[in-house]
């Protein structure tokens, strides 16, 4: 009897851990929108402790997004994620203070917020572009 209970318990555990699921539901992000990447991303090291990033906003931004578009910059210092800033008025440059002894990587992305007409209930209100990576050593 004890053996039957053990086998039944094992069978129940195996079935519960390998239950069916619909992969399409998990993979579906539900968005058919994309945000274009920033263009012409460059940096200029003004002096030993200041770096200015410059970029341009693409001329074609889908009308589904509010203007102005935000720019998000992630800051990685010596391969450690340090900070993220968001510029909200379509700025095309930003200056950072750096430590000359450290290596920096900046990831520049556009962030679009849907207009009220295009916002779907239960869905994200923003779309982020792929990042453009700038290495400063």
What are these regions (language model features)?
Residues 57, 73-77, 110-114:
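Residue-level signal for short segments within beta-strands and strand-turn junctions
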Residues 21-65, 116-137:
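Pro/Thr/Ser/Gly-rich low-complexity, intrinsically disordered linker/stalk tracts
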Residues 96-125:
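Beta-strand-rich modules
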Residues 15-19:
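C-terminal motif of bacterial Sec signal peptides marking the signal peptidase cleavage site
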Residues 84-90:
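Short beta-strand segments within Ig-like beta-sandwich modules, predominantly Fibronectin type-III
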Residues 10-11, 86:
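Short, linear, compositionally biased motifs with a strong N-terminal bias
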Residues 1-8:
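Bacterial N-terminal signal peptides that target proteins for export
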Residues 61-83:
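Extracellular low-complexity, O-glycosylation-prone stalks/linkers
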């Amino acid at each position: 009897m004890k053996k039957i209970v053990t086998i039944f318990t094992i069978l129940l555990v195996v079935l519960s851990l390998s239950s069916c699921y619909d992969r399409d539901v998990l993979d579906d992000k539900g968005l058919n929108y994309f945000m274009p990447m920033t263009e012409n991303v460059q940096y200029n090291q003004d002096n030993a402790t200041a770096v200015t990033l410059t970029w341009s906003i693409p001329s074609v931004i889908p009308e589904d997004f509010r203007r102005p578009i935000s720019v998000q910059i992630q800051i990685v210092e010596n391969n450690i994620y340090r900070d993220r800033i968001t510029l909200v008025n379509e700025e095309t440059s930003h200056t950072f203070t750096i430590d000359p002894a450290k290596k920096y990587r900046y990831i520049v992305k556009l962030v679009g917020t849907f207009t009220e007409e295009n916002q779907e209930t239960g869905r994200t209100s923003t779309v982020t572009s792929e990042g453009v990576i700038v290495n400063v050593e």
